[in-house]
Amino acid sequence: MKIDYLTLFPEMFDGVLNHSILKRAQDKEIIQVNTVNFRDYSINKHNQVDDYPFGGGQGMVLKPEPVFNAMKDLETSEATRVILMCPQGKPFSQEIAQDLSSAEHIVFICGHYEGYDERIREHLVTDEISIGDYVLTGGELPAMTMTDAIVRLIPGVLGNEQSHQDDSFSDGLLEFPQYTRPREFEGMNVPDVLLSGNHAKIDAWRHEQKLIRTFVKRPDLLAKYPLTTEDEKILENYKKQLKTK
């Protein structure tokens, strides 16, 4: 996978891209990353990339020329996913990350200032994505967040392919509780079932915990999850236990 970032602050990506999983993915040549400072493509003698909005208003708007010119220098195809990071976009999710993990080429357009000239949105972009209902100074941090979520799903990136399948949201539920040594710590014990060696019971316990944890912390996710009859019994029993406490 090739990933390009159009940004005014390419140095922001150095720390994230040169550590941990993203660095290993580059070392394995699974991904190729490239940052492009679209200020270099300004047609203004002062390298200006923004201007006042027509019709008046607060803030500055990114001009179309630098972004269009930068895109022309990239080797794109009809299959290239050009992502505009903006609060108006579709909320980012594990499902979107899974979809993008199969792309051969992704371009992130990371804006700053008040917003983008609408012609960028209309003529260059394939996907508008937001990482939440809040406003950040620029699109760099959302692009980094998305990159991490996407790349770890590409086959060969993680040491254990099962790892991401057990993550929260991978199957529509939150992840089950995790424990490691010591078995007992300051009076707090690891559940006996995890030490039993009975993998069927362990799997059943983990699924039960995922259901309960999702019900407690993210009940909205259960509305989209295909509950089985057994799942419904687990949740009913949990609700009864709550009433007796």
Swiss-Prot record:
Range of residues in the leader sequence: none
Transmembrane parts of this sequence: none
InterPro entries cross-referenced by the UniProt entry: Alpha/beta_knot_MTases (IPR029028), tRNA_m1G_MeTrfase_C_sf (IPR023148), tRNA_m1G_MeTrfase_TrmD (IPR002649), tRNA_m1G_MTases_N (IPR029026), tRNA_MeTrfase_TRMD/TRM10 (IPR016009)
Enzyme Commission (EC) number: 2.1.1.228
Keyword terms: Cytoplasm, Methyltransferase, S-adenosyl-L-methionine, Transferase, tRNA processing
GO molecular function: tRNA (guanine(37)-N1)-methyltransferase activity
Subcellular location: Cytoplasm
Listed GO biological process terms: tRNA N1-guanine methylation
Catalytic activity as recorded in UniProt: guanosine(37) in tRNA + S-adenosyl-L-methionine = N(1)-methylguanosine(37) in tRNA + S-adenosyl-L-homocysteine + H(+)
One GO cellular component term: cytosol
List of residues binding S-adenosyl-L-methionine: G111, I131, G132, D133, Y134, V135, L136
Enzyme class: transferase
Subunit and interaction comment: Homodimer.
NCBIfam families per UniProt: PRK00026.1 (NF000648), trmD (TIGR00088)
HAMAP family: TrmD (MF_00605)
Function: Specifically methylates guanosine-37 in various tRNAs.
Family to which the UniProt record says this protein belongs: Belongs to the RNA methyltransferase TrmD family.
Protein name: tRNA (guanine-N(1)-)-methyltransferase
Organism: Staphylococcus carnosus (strain TM300)
Gene: trmD
